[in-house]
């Protein structure tokens, strides 16, 4: 049996996941990161994207996160996300509409337009779409 480690994924609103896992994959500030039992202690920021969780008995669960912090300690992994949603809770139609609206705003900016903010929101919606597409496979 594979070695396991405790994982807690929480957002400001809710606890999304808590349990023993074999490993997780997440997008950190420096790129893709895999964590499993025995990983060196680590603290890094995370980007909008998917947390791929391999649970204790090998089942996979996908969680969308947008911003936050990943902390790895001996025996424990914490994902403290600004936003976190189970992949199944994402509404594809709403995400597609948000993406279209953001692309239109970027193409035709208003006087009080904040490009950096719009680009960050667009990156989040694209990450959500990637996760939805991965769920379909």
From Swiss-Prot:
InterPro entries: ATP_F1_dsu/esu_C_sf (IPR036794), ATP_synth_F1_dsu/esu (IPR001469), ATP_synth_F1_dsu/esu_N (IPR020546), ATP_synth_F1_esu_C (IPR020547), ATPsynth_dsu/esu_N (IPR036771). It is found in: Cell inner membrane. The keyword Signal does not apply. One of its GO terms (molecular function) is ATP binding. CDD domains: F1-ATPase_delta (cd12152). Pfam families: ATP-synt_DE, ATP-synt_DE_N. It is a peripheral membrane protein. It comes from the Bacteria. Gene3D superfamilies: ATP synthase delta/epsilon subunit, C-terminal domain, F0F1 ATP synthase delta/epsilon subunit, N-terminal. GO terms for cellular component: plasma membrane; proton-transporting ATP synthase complex. Its main location: membrane. Coiled coil: none annotated. PANTHER family: ATP SYNTHASE DELTA/EPSILON CHAIN, ATP SYNTHASE EPSILON CHAIN, CHLOROPLASTIC. F-type ATPases have 2 components, CF(1) - the catalytic core - and CF(0) - the membrane proton channel. CF(1) has five subunits: alpha(3), beta(3), gamma(1), delta(1), epsilon(1). CF(0) has three main subunits: a, b and c. Produces ATP from ADP in the presence of a proton gradient across the membrane. This is ATP synthase epsilon chain.
